[in-house]
Swiss-Prot record:
PANTHER family (alphabetical): AMINO-ACID ACETYLTRANSFERASE, AMINO-ACID ACETYLTRANSFERASE NAGS1, CHLOROPLASTIC-RELATED
GO cellular component terms, semicolon-separated: cytoplasm
Organism in which the protein naturally occurs: Shewanella oneidensis (strain ATCC 700550 / JCM 31522 / CIP 106686 / LMG 19005 / NCIMB 14063 / MR-1)
Other facts: In bacteria which possess the bifunctional enzyme ornithine acetyltransferase/N-acetylglutamate synthase (ArgJ), ArgA fulfills an anaplerotic role.
GO molecular function: L-glutamate N-acetyltransferase activity
Protein name listed in UniProt: Amino-acid acetyltransferase
Compartment(s) where it occurs, according to its Swiss-Prot or TrEMBL record: Cytoplasm
Domain of life: Bacteria
Signal peptide: none
SUPFAM superfamilies reported in the protein's UniProt record: Acyl-CoA N-acyltransferases (Nat) (SSF55729), Carbamate kinase-like (SSF53633)
A single BP term in Gene Ontology: L-arginine biosynthetic process
Residue ranges occupied by any N-acetyltransferase domain in the UniProt entry: 299-445
Catalytic reactions of this protein: L-glutamate + acetyl-CoA = N-acetyl-L-glutamate + CoA + H(+)
């Protein structure tokens, strides 16, 4: 008998546990995944397709739209045909369309073959995926623009949403390429971004997902912007267009995301095709890894309720154990819960603060300010303070005070000044703990 030594690791267990809420949340939802030609040209595209298969196995309805921009350019050049563009849109003549059909067909076979694999010791073992393609998109010609004839370049005329839904309900992955037919029986070359956008809109998809060479949209410091509203995304798109330095695929998907969000798709995600597992990390972790363009923020600031007590206790308990916060019992929190504001992200309480009234002194106490350690990079504490200040002013308070042992400079940076114990309201002064020796700070409102 041979015994195998087993190494115990908590990473896999922790990963499963942390992803479980997202597995449950995504089950039965519809995702439109757009793989541009740039992504398909990378070795990592096999891993991406494995991850798409995993989404399918978790009960997610997947429409996979692929593009072929670099592959088409290379094939045209190999056939002695100069690629022609106008305003970033390909001009497709009859000779070009023949080549484009060959390229699109080859890519379709490659993707189908990869998603049909079920070898042992591979991520696709036992997958048994049914892949469906068809005439779900009806095209029409782009026509002539400013004297430029786009010939056989087309755009979406309509989407067979009911046909798509039937296939998705039958547990199929729908695969869609850049070639679509018109009502006259002609074939047209469309952009993958437009197909993905229109499919997502017509299906009322829950997400549209795209890939770029970067992990999303970067700010001026080179850091990934986690979340953008459509109007902010439009400003960034305009700036990127002026600079002319951004990847064509990135700009095209950003534009498509803005259009999709403005037409009812709640969230669009942009992740890197170079980062192995980026798709899964974006969808099944609270932090994500790329950029979301959203119609409504994943985070929201709201007043706490009784059901939030467990989340608040989990947030403040580590600081209580370190002696940074005064310990609060569950019973005390139940009594004081209406004084609390919190920041919630995907069901997790990631920040909280309280405003305790001292009406007889026309003052309020700013207390129990806590932000989760993983979310201290976006000035959420200032957001909570701003909200509490607004509440205090609306109640007519003239002063806001706070007690702290560790965050003196943070309060000073936000306009507070150091006071002595005698400056406290009488009731608070009677409860002051001289052993903790908390610093007293106040802000005139």
């Amino acid at each position: 008998m041979r015994c195998k030594q087993r190494v115990r690791t908590t990473e896999l267990v922790d990963g499963f546990r942390h992803s479980a809420p997202y597995v449950n949340a995504h089950r039965g939802k519809t995702f439109v995944v757009m793989l541009g030609g740039e992504a398909l040209a990378q070795n990592q595209f096999r891993g991406i397709l494995n991850d798409v298969a995993l989404l399918h196995s978790l009960g997610i309805k997947v429409v996979l739209v692929y593009g072929a921009r670099p592959q088409i350019d290379a094939a045209l050049a190999a056939n002695g045909i100069e690629p022609a563009y106008h305003d970033g849109v390909r001009i497709t003549d009859e000779d070009s369309l023949k080549v484009i059909k060959q390229v699109a067909g080859a890519l379709q076979f490659d993707i189908t073959a990869r998603l049909s694999m079920s070898l042992s010791n591979t991520p696709m073992q036992g997958a048994q995926i049914n892949l469906v393609s068809g005439n779900f998109v009806i095209a029409q010609p782009l026509g002539v623009d400013n004297g430029v004839d786009f010939c056989l370049s087309g755009k979406v005329r309509r989407i067979d949403a009911q046909g798509l839904k039937r296939q998705l309900d039958n547990h199929c992955i729908v695969l869609m390429g850049p070639i679509a037919a018109s009502v006259t029986g002609e074939s047209f070359n469309l952009t993958a971004e437009e197909i993905a956008t229109q499919v997502a809109i017509k299906l009322k998809a829950d997400k549209m997902i795209g890939f770029s060479s970067q992990n999303g949209i970067l700010d001026r410091n080179g850091d990934v912007i986690a979340e953008l509203m459509p109007n902010d995304a439009q400003k960034i798109l305009n700036k990127l267009a002026e600079q002319g330095s951004a990847c064509i695929g990135t700009m095209a998907f950003l534009k498509a995301s803005i259009d999709a969000c403005r037409n009812g798709v709640p969230r669009c995600h942009l992740v890197s095709y170079l980062d192995d597992g980026a798709l899964l990390q974006e969808l099944f972790s609270r932090e994500g890894i790329g950029t979301q363009i959203v119609t409504e923020s994943a985070e929201r600031l709201r007043r706490a309720s009784i059901s939030d007590i467990g989340g608040i206790l989990n947030l403040i308990r580590p600081l209580e154990e370190q002696g940074i916060l005064v310990r609060r019992s569950r019973e005390q929190l139940e009594i004081e819960i209406e004084q609390f504001m919190l920041i919630e992200r995907d069901g997790l309480v990631i920040g909280c603060a309280a405003l305790y009234p001292f009406e007889e002194d026309n003052a309020g106490e700013f207390a129990c300010l806590v932000v989760h350690p993983d979310y201290r990079d976006a000035d959420r504490g200032s957001l909570l303070l701003k909200n509490i200040i607004g509440q205090a002013r609306s109640r007519g308070y003239s002063r806001l005070f706070a007690l702290t042992t560790r965050s003196i400079h943070w309060f000073l940076e936000h306009g507070f000044v150091i006071e002595d114990v005698d400056a406290l309201p009488q009731k608070k002064k009677q409860l002051y703990n001289y052993q903790r020796r908390s610093k007293i700070l106040a802000l005139d409102l």
